[in-house]
């Protein structure tokens, strides 16, 4: 159990520049491998797709790793702020995961429990704070960010070829349609 007074509150600085892609990274609480199972990964992919439709943003690349997620998104409207996108992605996954753990693996909840000084208790799925957020303001940088995202499972030794990792957009960029989530292919500067 973690006491809230023992935790330094992390804050993500966000610059919601209209017409600017965002490279986002966020992690599981205490870097626990909470995204190692297909069930939880599918919840995340479902949440990505729902948030994309709700907040009107393009998803150019993603990868789901066992304890963190990388995204490259492009907001199509001023309403698609980073805070809204992240809440729309993270909240449904956390709620489903905590409910599932309560019903099936309650011992795991202890690792995710945080007690506030007031005595209020909560269970964390995601690391506190928003994670990493960078505006990608140069079009020439976008393909490099996509490649970096796709190579995560290769660098970790989970696969030898990026497109072999099913929880990534790498296979989509190779032209495969049998993917977990179809992304909005980056084909140069947005119109």
Which residues does each predicted region cover?
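Short catalytic/metal-binding and nucleic-acid-binding patches
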Residues: 1-191
């Amino acid at each position: 159990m973690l006491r809230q007074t023992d935790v330094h509150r992390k804050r993500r600085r966000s610059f919601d520049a209209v017409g600017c892609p965002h490279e986002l990274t966020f992690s599981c609480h205490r870097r626990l491998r909470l995204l190692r199972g297909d069930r939880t990964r599918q919840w995340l992919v479902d949440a990505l797709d729902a948030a994309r439709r709700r907040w009107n943003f393009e998803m150019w690349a993603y990868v789901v790793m066992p304890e963190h997620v990388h995204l490259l998104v492009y907001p199509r409207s001023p309403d698609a702020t980073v805070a809204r996108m992240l809440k729309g992605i993270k909240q449904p996954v956390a709620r489903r995961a905590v409910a599932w753990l309560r019903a099936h693996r309650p011992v795991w909840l202890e690792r995710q429990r945080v007690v506030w000084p007031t005595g209020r208790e909560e269970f964390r799925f995601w690391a506190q704070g928003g994670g990493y957020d960078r505006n990608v303001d140069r079009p020439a940088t976008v393909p490099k960010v996509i490649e970096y995202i796709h190579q995560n499972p290769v660098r970790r030794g989970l696969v030898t070829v990026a497109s072999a990792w099913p929880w990534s957009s790498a296979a989509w960029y190779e032209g495969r349609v049998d993917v977990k989530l179809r992304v909005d292919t980056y084909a140069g500067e947005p119109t």
